[in-house]
A protein has these predicted regions:
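Small-residue-rich helix-loop
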Residues: 49-51, 302-382
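Beta-lactamase-like hydrolase cores
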Residues: 18-59, 63, 76-83, 120, ...
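Positively charged n-region of N-terminal signal peptides that target proteins for export
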Residues: 1-6
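Bacterial N-terminal signal peptides
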Residues: 7-17
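Short, structural beta-strand-to-alpha-helix junction motif
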Residues: 63, 281-282, 347
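Conserved serine DD-peptidase/penicillin-binding transpeptidase domain
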Residues: 24-27, 75-330
Length: 382
């Protein structure tokens, strides 16, 4: 009963987006230049209470995450976890490993995320396990292996979004939410971002950031660019490099030498497991990303439903899932899992059907509990 009421409340919020219209339905400023789509259904009475532009494809923005979460929960289940394996590759000679330390990434969007305190300490765990194995030196490098297809910013995202923290993209290896803090006047970053180039510009209008997809050059505009206390948050161009550098430095600081020899090898190639890191459960990740409207994590959960495939295949599987449930997404445009692309289109009634299906499913209590509460928390607190 409680779950059904909760989902009905979500339906109203999910159908609002901007475009053009001469009508005013909700009475907010600027509504005459907006398209408002509404679909409200009383699930207990099985009766549609109100609908307006319910079949119109509207840019959903972050309400796309409601569909992504429903899909991920259905395919993966609430207890699914990403597992990142750390291995030694090469051969052992006493306390020395002749070869590399390899982090086999699985596009876990939560690795060392600040939003999951209980799962922090990845580097420390690797260090402690190597010590327990008696390894004191590694002749090769810390290699971060990535396998995610079409990683990085979604091509249809606006270039102006890429450098800002909300525009953090999903990669094969993700680290610290794929963001960093930069002090432009000094060039210092936290964490250290290898290969980053910063170009500063003075601008009286305020702070602006710009970085092209795949570029390691970040352009920063600001009023007082010489202020050493001024800092900005931006996105990592290559999270795998940041992870590799940080883990290498942590190992060296703990007394485990990493020689960094790219040609380090041995005739006998072996693999030994050092550590397996598990992410939070899918339900925990989904709740966090929905409450905060985290774009990168939404992309990670969408891609998780089709491991080894590209983004289009993940979207195809999502459409097939709902089509099998009698809800066609054929004429709804789905480009990403976060809703950051302006090319996404969802009809309010279609999203309403998805939410209704979830309310009547075995996840009828869990699914609504993942969303932020208006006036209480997350991006709906005020």
């Amino acid at each position: 009963m409680k779950a059904l009421k909760s989902v009905a409340a979500i339906l109203l919020v999910a159908g609002i987006s901007l475009s053009s219209s001469a009508e005013t339905i909700l009475g907010f400023d600027g509504e005459e230049t907006a398209t408002v789509g509404i679909y409200i259904k009383d699930l207990q009475e099985d009766k549609v209470i109100a609908e307006h532009n319910a079949l119109t494809g509207i840019t959903p923005a972050s309400t796309m995450k409601a569909l992504t979460a429903a899909t991920a929960l259905s395919v993966l289940g609430p207890d699914y976890r990403f597992s990142t394996h750390v291995n030694l590759r090469g051969s052992r000679q006493g306390a020395s490993w002749q070869g590399d330390l390899v982090v086999n990434s699985v596009a876990d969007p939560t690795l060392e995320s600040e939003y999951f305190d209980k799962n922090l300490g990845f580097c420390d765990s690797v260090v402690s396990h190597l010590r327990a194995m008696g390894i004191k030196s590694i002749t090769g490098r810390v290699v971060v292996a990535e396998s995610l297809k079409d990683a990085g910013p979604v091509p249809q995202w606006e270039i102006e979004d890429v450098a800002w923290s909300y525009g953090a993209a999903l990669y094969g290896a993700n680290w610290r939410d794929n963001v960093f803090r930069l002090w432009p006047a000094t060039g210092r970053t936290k964490p250290h971002v290898p290969g980053l180039k910063v170009e500063l510009h003075r601008d009286a209008d305020g702070t602006e950031l710009l970085r092209g997809a795949g570029s390691s050059t970040l352009e920063v505009w600001g009023r007082d660019i010489n202020n050493a206390k001024w800092s900005v948050m931006s996105t990592m161009p290559n999270p795998a490099m940041v992870l590799s550098h940080e883990l290498t430095e942590r190992l060296r600081g703990a007394g485990i030498s990493v020689n960094g020899d790219k040609s380090a090898s041995s005739q006998k190639q072996e693999t030994e497991t050092v550590y397996v890191h598990h992410s939070p459960a899918a339900s925990t990740i989904l709740k966090s990303l929905l409450v905060r409207s985290d774009n990168m994590m939404a992309e990670g959960m969408l891609r998780a439903i089709a491991p080894g495939d590209d983004r289009k295949d993940a979207v195809k599987r999502e459409k097939e899932l709902w089509d099998a449930r009698g809800i066609s997404l054929k004429y709804n445009g789905i480009i990403d899992g976060s809703g950051l692309s302006m090319g996404n289109k969802l009809a309010p009634r279609t999203l309403g059907y998805v939410l209704e299906w979830m309310a009547r499913s075995p996840y009828g209590e869990l699914y609504p509990s993942l969303f932020p509460r208006a006036g209480v928390n997350g991006n709906m607190k005020s």
